[in-house]
Swiss-Prot record:
GO terms for cellular component: nucleus. It is found in: Nucleus. Residues 54-72 have a biased composition (Basic and acidic residues). Its EC number is 3.2.2.31. The gene is MYH. Pfam families: HhH-GPD (PF00730), NUDIX_4 (PF14815). Its cofactor is [4Fe-4S] cluster. This is Adenine DNA glycosylase. It comes from Arabidopsis thaliana. Residues 73-123 have a biased composition (Acidic residues). It is an enzyme of class 3 (hydrolase). It catalyses: Hydrolyzes free adenine bases from 7,8-dihydro-8-oxoguanine:adenine mismatched double-stranded DNA, leaving an apurinic site.
Length: 630
């Protein structure tokens, strides 16, 4: 190989040496073996940078998958909150008549008699005192440091009440760790109820040009945007409406539970939390954690979702609440359920009231009984299966000289599941369908939803349309399979023809850039869709890059291979029959081979990617052509 390199690099190498080696068959065989060895070595070296690139891509893809899994976990919590919203809407819509209330009172009395007398007698005075003392002492030492537990002076009770209100609303159906960052961000923007009262639910500044559908990007991040990611957006709407109601009133912030329940969005639980924590009123609070603690304290195995059972839990909590420190006691009861008296793994050995816990006592007496048997677990109905096709509609408009396309979002109805949130155009299907059926359903929806006055193909030119993939989205009672397609269109005329029937005051759609998507109040299912498109683009870019590098590398190797074969053929042919052509041709061929060999080796040594090199060469040729030099 050293000899071969000297031929390529040393122009003074004697021609006689080449001629003598050309006449020796052993030299030909040795040369062939060395070329084969070099080809194998260079091919392995050439693929090393690409393998390194692919390894980095795989590592990056794994990190993206982990981030997606975390987003899915948060999305599941959000969907639970959204389902709770739907249930709350139904409960709110059902108004009880006087006759039903009387019947419930009679049933409640019968239930109390079945439990062994008045509900107030279930806890003895001694038990009540021990539970209060044990919980408060434990809470003073072990309470978590949460931003909404800051103490306020007497003159700042209203601000304290506002902080409790915001935190309790956010904590509904949402983990504490998730709420903390949202709470801090919320309080920085609206530190008092009067600041919140001046906000708007969604203040969209729409261009008054011909193209109402395209926003300028200066949308204000108001309540829904600040709430984005928490889910259950009905809570944000009620917070805003309640704040406006309080600010508009003349009596200030209500300081009693009965008055607080008259404020929009404040129910019995939230009213009890605000009144006891901020205004020191001796009223109970009952949530899922409190129900679990009370059910185990008294070994109540009844269904906690039953209305009569829920009423009994409220009476138990009212009996236990400490009149001197009602706020701290209510928080200690909730803290115990959240940290020690958990659903599946209670820490009874660390519990401050285990000696008063009936469920723990029964589990010690009988090993077949477990503390986790209380309260009774409600059997959930199996989720139904449905199917949804989503169209990521990307619109380009050359008239506005946009750097990129914008995505069409449709606003959901103000009532019902996911009320008022934004999503990509989508259609729910009754059964699983093939690609053609799904595409036809999307076409029909686009024409109807956007009130096209012309056919879709006449209003715009379809640049591309392809399926991006599918995923499964889990609701509490629905298992939805979502099919995603990307439709890229180029407007052929003014956008006033595309969305002519849409008025600004009834805005149900808008077009936003990809940067704005993350700031909007989107459903968790919608947030799963964009990664499909991003992965699709990355995959195409990577494939093109790798393909170009592979082609250039393979071509260079093929040139080396064919040149070496031609040279060996000429030399072997001259041994059998003296070559009568141009006696310099074989030397030129050998020189060409080593020029290519030297070029390829230099690129590998310098770490030059053949894809980048090809782009540079193409750019150079294009420049020369434009200058008239080629």
């Amino acid at each position: 190989m050293a000899c071969l390199l000297r031929v390529a690099l040393n122009p003074t190498f004697e021609r006689s040496t080449v001629a003598s080696q050309r006449q020796n068959p052993k030299t030909i065989l040795s040369f062939h073996c060395k070329v084969s060895s070099f080809k194998t070595k260079t091919m392995s070296q050439s693929f090393a940078p690409r393998e390194k690139l692919m390894r980095k891509c795989r590592e990056k893809k794994e990190a993206e998958r982990e981030a997606e899994r975390e987003a899915e976990r948060e999305a599941e919590e959000e969907e639970k909150a959204e389902e709770a919203e739907a249930e709350a809407d139904k409960e709110e819509a059902e108004e009880e008549s006087e006759e039903e209330e009387e019947e419930e009172e009679e049933e409640a009395e019968a239930e109390e008699e079945a439990l062994g007398g008045d509900i107030e007698d279930l806890f003895s005075e001694n038990e009540t005192q021990k539970i209060r003392m044990g919980l408060l002492d434990w809470y003073d030492v072990n309470k978590r440091d949460l931003p909404w537990r800051n103490r306020r002076s007497e003159s700042e009770k209203e601000r304290r009440a506002y902080e409790v209100w915001v935190s309790e609303i956010m904590l509904q159906q949402t983990r504490v760790q998730t709420v903390m960052k949202y709470y801090k961000r919320w309080m920085q923007k609206w530190p008092t109820i009067y600041d919140l009262g001046q906000a708007s639910l969604e203040n969209l500044i729409v261009s008054r040009s011909r193209e109402l559908s395209f926003l300028r990007g200066n949308e204000k991040k108001e309540v829904n945007e600040m709430w984005a990611g928490l889910g259950y957006y009905r809570r944000a709407r009620f917070l805003l409406e309640g704040a406006k109601m309080v600010v508009a009133g003349t009596e200030g912030f209500p300081n009693q539970a009965s008055s607080l329940m008259k404020v929009k969005g404040i129910g019995q639980y939230t009213a009890g939390a605000i009144a006891s924590i901020a205004f020191n009123e001796a009223v109970p609070v009952v949530d899922g954690n409190v129900i679990r603690v009370l059910a185990r304290l008294k070994a109540i195995s009844a269904n906690p979702k039953d209305r009569l059972t829920a009423r009994n839990f409220w009476k138990l909590a009212a009996q236990l609440v400490d009149p001197s420190r009602p706020g701290d006691f209510n928080q200690s009861l909730m803290e115990l359920g959240a940290t020690l008296c958990t659903v599946s793994k209670p820490s009874c050995s660390s519990c401050p009231v285990s000696s008063q816990c009936r469920a723990f006592s029964l589990s010690e007496e009988n090993r077949t009984i477990s503390v986790t048997d209380y309260p009774t677990k409600v059997i959930k109905a199996k989720p139904r299966h449905d199917f949804c096709c989503v169209c990521v509609l990307e619109i380009h408009n050359l008239e506005r000289n946009q750097s990129g396309g914008r995505f069409v979002l449709v606003k959901r109805p103000e009532q019902g599941l996911l009320a008022g949130l934004w999503e990509f155009p989508s259609v729910i299907l009754n059964e699983e369908a093939d690609s053609a059926t799904r595409r036809n359903a999307i076409n029909v929806y686009l024409k109807e939803a956007f009130r096209f006055h012309v056919e879709l193909k006449k209003a715009c030119t379809i640049v591309s349309r392809e399926e991006l993939g599918e995923f499964v989205h889990i609701f509490t009672h629905i298992r939805r399979k979502v099919y995603v397609e990307l439709l890229v269109v180029q407007l052929t005329g003014g956008t006033e023809d595309l969305f002519k029937g849409q008025a600004k005051d009834t805005l149900t759609w808008k077009c936003v850039s990809s940067d704005v998507l993350s700031t909007l109040g989107l459903t968790s299912a919608v947030r799963k869709v964009p990664p499909f498109r991003l992965q699709h683009i990355k995959r195409l870019s990577l494939d093109v890059m790798v393909e170009k590098e592979q082609i250039l590398e393979c071509r260079c190797i093929q040139w080396l291979k064919h040149t070496s074969k031609a040279y060996l053929f000429l030399m072997s042919h001259q041994i059998e029959q003296p070559y009568r052509g141009n006696e310099n041709s074989h030397d030129l061929l050998l020189t060409l081979f080593f020029m290519l060999l030297s070029f390829y080796s230099s690129c590998l040594a310098l770490g030059i990617k053949f894809g980048d090199l090809g782009l540079k060469l193409n750019s150079l040729v294009s420049t020369e052509k434009s200058d008239g030099d080629v």
